[in-house]
Amino acid sequence: MNDTKRLRRPSAGGYVRGDETRLRIIEAAIESFGEHGFEGASTRDIAARAGVNAPALQYYFENKEGVYRACAEYIADASWETFEPVVTHAAEVLSNDSDTPVLIDAFIRIQEAIADRMFLKACGPTNQRLFFAREQAGHEPSIASEILTRRLRQPLNDVGSRLIARITGTKPDDPLALIRMLSLHGQLLMFHVAPRTTLALLGWTEIDAEKGELLKATVRAQTRILLEQWSNEASNEVLANARESSGSKKPVARAVAKKTAARKSTTASAKK
């Protein structure tokens, strides 16, 4: 999408009137795409939800594919505002060769940002959740996945896997490190993709700020326990390998010492 199609902020602050209309269309489109999918959503329905005439969509986005792309870009922009600080912090602690407790805290900060984005940001989370669900099902245009992967998932997964690798003594591309990262993030996933089931089980009607903090505290504690355990296991394995390596050298050293002593004894006898 060319720059003329992007939101433009005036120097005085806020959005120009045309950009307000564009934003309304995007929010309406996220809702429509989430409910009906790309094929089921119509430009007429999107225009009606946004309170504009159908030709306005063509003016701002050219076609329905352009609207869909703009929705993915909008979600990526809004999400990155939440994730950029924790991703930057994680990259810094990794480059500073920080100790394990600092690395664990950095990973937990990423999880908390994910939870905030899922539950606590007042920017149409329900509609965006449906949009995400359809995109993940693989039946929607691939452009959304490409945008969200490049701008959100890849940066998050990169620092997340590097943190896990450093904490647990593996490599970032090791399947074990990736499985551990995904399983830790998966603690939040059930509440995001199956809210009806989880809320009914808990007797909740929604996840407000207080309940969101309870979720974060629970996940934070569980994540810390697991990361500390995996770190300790890795340290113990290193020590065990070091002892084994050291132990294997002792018999060789003793054998060499015996041979040296024998040679000295033989030499002494010959001199006599």
What residue spans do the PLM features occupy?
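Amphipathic alpha-helical linker/stalk segments
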Residues: 71-106
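Short Lys/Arg-rich basic patches
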Residues: 9-15, 21
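C-terminal peripheral helix-coil segments that are non-catalytic and often amphipathic
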Residues: 1-9, 109, 113-124, 150-179, ...
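Helix-turn-helix
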Residues: 24, 32-74
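Short, leucine-enriched amphipathic alpha-helices that occur as contiguous helical runs
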Residues: 18, 22-30
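Hydrophobic, aromatic-enriched interface-forming segments
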Residues: 121-153
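A short secondary-structure junction motif
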Residues: 78, 82, 86, 135, ...
